[in-house]
A protein has these predicted regions:
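N-terminal Lys/Arg-rich, disordered targeting/topogenic segments
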Residues: 1-29
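Non-catalytic, solvent-exposed segments at the cell envelope interface
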Residues: 2, 25, 48-645, 654, ...
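N-terminal compositionally biased, intrinsically disordered segments and leader/signal-like regions
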Residues: 6, 13, 511, 656-659
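Coil-to-alpha-helix initiation sites in intrinsically disordered, low-complexity, charged segments
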Residues: 17-22, 28, 116, 696, ...
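Short amphipathic alpha-helical segments that mediate assembly, nucleic-acid/protein binding
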Residues: 20, 86, 179, 411, ...
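Hydrophobic membrane-insertion alpha-helices, especially the h-region
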Residues: 34-50
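Ser/Thr/Gly/Pro-rich low-complexity, disordered linker/stalk segments of secreted
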Residues: 650, 654-708, 713-718
């Protein structure tokens, strides 16, 4: 038998035959053991690596879900708006947190903690996530369950049961307790070895403090909820609908009023009805009314429709409460508050909850509600009784629709609608209990402008221009206004020049009038501003003639389609209106005895169709003013939108080295970026600004985070800035 010698050709067919296998079988045993061990080790490493990679991937996904849902929830809670249902967002946050917690607490991470230098980091991460998990599955889930209880409510016979909200104080109290416990645990966590993990740990502790602080700001309101909802007995809230088709200083004529009652958590909406047949009280509400009559008219307080000639809503609300209680059957009712709405507010509510259909088939929605109330109603239904019926029907239908559709899905847009419209004067609020008023506004969900008052802060000066229609008709849909504010400087003031020349604005024919009252010394007064306010009647004569008599006034108006206004000017708190020029038909009063500021009233001349008139006046603000002058006007609603004054815009004619040059370019700038939201940022936000600007106090993480919270909320940016 021949023996083959030499190398074996592995490329021949015998490599796959029996002899090929025999070659492998002749491989040394130690080599095979090494190969098996290497393959086993490689497989083990691959499996472990795959296991951890998959776990990390799942945690990254879950963490992103937590972040996204928390961000959406914050936007919803702050009224910033969100495109997702509040209940869906809340449930996603619960699910994502539970999934993330379960993954990180898996046995694979026990091994990693015990056999690597990252043990302290794993422990810290677990403790941080455990604290979030405790809160999410504790008070947050309680709130979620509460929202689900509310989600199914419906309006029945004008009533809805929201008594579930009365459980909120206990839930929030538990949240404060849980947060305190979690902060105690996190403070005991050893310092992580990885700097980024240590930073995240500090960020979470700061965030928990912020959440606790923010909840604390809502404590007043939350603890009041049972009281507001009638836990101790029935309460009545009057809802006034003002119509800008017939302007009044505070917004518009009061067309209808309804009583909303809250009793043991059940809210009932009464009928919206006209006030034209109300009985007139025999005595004025109080002694202040006697002073108010000197400015606003001898009988302005005797009819709801004329009370809003007074621009101070807090007084208007009390007068309407007084008159409502005077009506037969209302004497013993407990009126706890008065709310004022206008078509802009109602339209915003429908934008959040959907459209309604009236009995004649007309659809009111986020674009048609304002034109209906301000114009179409009067041209399409010239009969007075029909108009009243449709106003009442529309207001009732909208409020019933909104209350019946207030749920987790609509909560965010509803909150945003209330927040935005209260900031622009279309939703106003007066509460009989000042603590309740303060608690409602302190939440930030209702802007502090909802009180309907001018700034009473001399550092944030505001002057007012208020219009009340005097002629017969509903023509203010056709009024267009523009406002300018100019800061003036020089050796001779603008008011002195105007009084000397008789001219402040060449468009005005009547001479300038000196309105200085001398209630302040020169040292108490600061910068001077010149304000112009132009009103244009956009009607043409042909259009005026085509309108129904109820709109253009018919034969009762000496100028068909003309506009005639009572004008009220108010000085900024601590300041003075020094000179006025206007085409005045009759001069009223100039007094500083009302509401601690100067009030000027006069009746202007007619504005004929196609014509315009201008009012000009000079203002000295207080010497301690730190913001430029803002002008607030009666909201004028027309086809182009809503006009409310200067919105903080100022033209500065002063040089850089003149006194107060920084004023017009102050903290909020002359462009009015913040002025539109309440006179250059006044009110509740000042406290944060003062705190953050104090060089001795410093800026800790909590204050920094809190100051950065604004709409829309961006948690990634907040976390990155810590």
């Amino acid at each position: 038998m021949n023996q083959q010698t030499g190398p074996v050709n592995l490329k021949t067919p015998q490599h796959v035959g029996g002899n090929g296998r025999s070659l492998i079988s002749r491989t040394p045993i130690w080599a095979r053991v090494v190969v098996v061990l290497l393959l086993t080790l490689l497989a083990s490493v691959t499996c472990v690596g795959t296991l951890y990679a998959a776990s990390v991937s799942r945690m990254a996904t879950d963490a992103q879900r937590v972040l996204t849902s928390a961000e959406s929830l914050a936007n919803s809670a702050l009224g910033c708006g969100s495109d997702k249902s509040l209940s869906d967002i809340s449930q996603e946050l619960v699910n994502a947190t539970n999934d993330l917690n379960a993954e990180l607490n898996g046995p694979q991470w026990d091994f990693f903690r015990d056999h690597s230098r990252f043990g302290s980091d794993i422990t810290a991460a677990r403790e941080m996530l455990a604290s979030v998990d405790t809160l999410v599955n504790g008070p947050f889930t309680d709130l979620l369950n509460l929202s689900k209880r509310l989600q199914g409510f419906s309006l029945k016979n004008g009533s809805v049961d929201v008594s579930a909200l009365m459980d909120m104080p206990d839930i929030v109290k538990q949240a404060h307790k849980d947060i305190s416990q979690q902060l105690t645990k996190l403070n005991k966590v050893p310092t992580p070895s990885v700097a980024k993990v240590a930073t995240v740990l500090e960020t979470e502790k700061a965030a928990l403090k912020t959440v606790d602080s923010m909840l604390g700001e809502y404590d007043g309101l939350i603890n009041l909820l049972p009281q507001l909802l009638g836990e101790d007995g029935k309460r009545t809230y009057l809802v006034m609908v003002q119509n800008p088709a017939e302007l009044r200083s505070a917004g518009g004529m009061v067309g209808t009023i309804a009583a909303i009652t809250a009793d043991k958590g059940t809210i009932t909406i009464g009928d919206f009805a006209t006030t034209s047949g109300w009985d007139i009280p025999e005595e004025p509400m109080d002694d202040t009314v006697l002073k108010e009559r000197q400015v606003f008219g001898g009988t302005f307080d005797q009819y709801p429709a004329t009370t809003t000639i007074d621009p101070e809503f807090q007084r208007v609300a009390q007068m309407n409460k007084y008159m409502w209680l005077y009506q037969k059957g209302n004497e013993d009712e407990n009126v706890a508050g008065v709310l004022s709405l206008d078509p802009v507010f109602l339209q915003a509510l429908l934008g959040a909850t959907g459209e309604v259909k009236l009995s004649d088939g007309r659809v009111l929605d986020s674009t048609t509600t304002v034109p209906f109330f301000a114009s179409d109603l009067y041209t399409d239904y010239p009969d007075f009784e029909q108009q009243n019926n449709f106003v009442s029907e529309a207001a009732q239908a909208i409020m019933n629709h909104v209350l019946g559709n207030a749920n987790a899905s609509t909560a965010s847009p509803l909150l945003k609608a209330i927040r935005d419209t209260s900031a622009s004067g279309h939703f106003k609020l007066w509460m009989a209990d000042p603590d309740e008023q303060e608690a409602l506004i302190a939440t930030g969900l209702i802007d502090d402008k909802a009180s309907g008052e001018l700034s009473a802060d001399s550092q944030v000066p505001e002057t007012g221009i208020y219009l009340s229609e005097l002629q017969q008709g509903k023509q203010d849909w056709y009024l267009k206004t523009s406002t300018t504010v100019t800061k003036t400087c020089g050796d001779v003031s603008a008011s002195q020049n105007a009084l000397y020349s008789g001219v402040l604005d060449k468009r005005i024919m009547t001479a300038v009038r000196n309105t200085q009252l001398g209630q302040f010394t020169e040292d108490q007064l600061g910068d001077e501003y010149t304000v112009t306010f132009t009103m244009k009647n956009t009607l043409t004569k042909a259009k005026a003639e085509s309108l129904p008599d109820f709109v253009n006034g018919g034969s009762e108006n000496p100028v068909l389609g003309g506009m005639l206004y009572r004008v009220v000017l108010t000085a900024p708190y601590g300041g003075e209106i020094t000179a006025v020029q206007a085409d005045i038909d009759s001069w009223g009063t100039n007094t500083a005895s009302l509401y601690d500021r100067q009030y000027i009233m006069f009746n202007q001349q007619w504005i004929e169709p196609g014509k315009e008139l201008t009012i000009a006046y000079t203002v000295r603000v207080s010497s301690d003013a730190t913001h430029p002058l803002n002008v607030v006007t009666t909201p004028v609603v027309n086809a182009d939108g809503v006009e409310t004054g200067s919105n903080g815009n100022v033209t500065d004619e002063c040089t850089a080295d003149t006194n107060g040059a920084d004023g017009a370019n102050g903290a909020d700038g002359a462009n009015g970026a913040d002025g539109a939201n309440g006179g250059a940022d006044g009110g509740k936000n000042d406290a944060h600004k003062d705190a953050s600007s104090d060089p001795s106090a410093g800026l800790d993480a909590l204050d920094k985070l809190k100051s950065q919270i604004s709409c829309p909320v961006d948690l990634k940016s907040l976390a990155g800035s810590m």
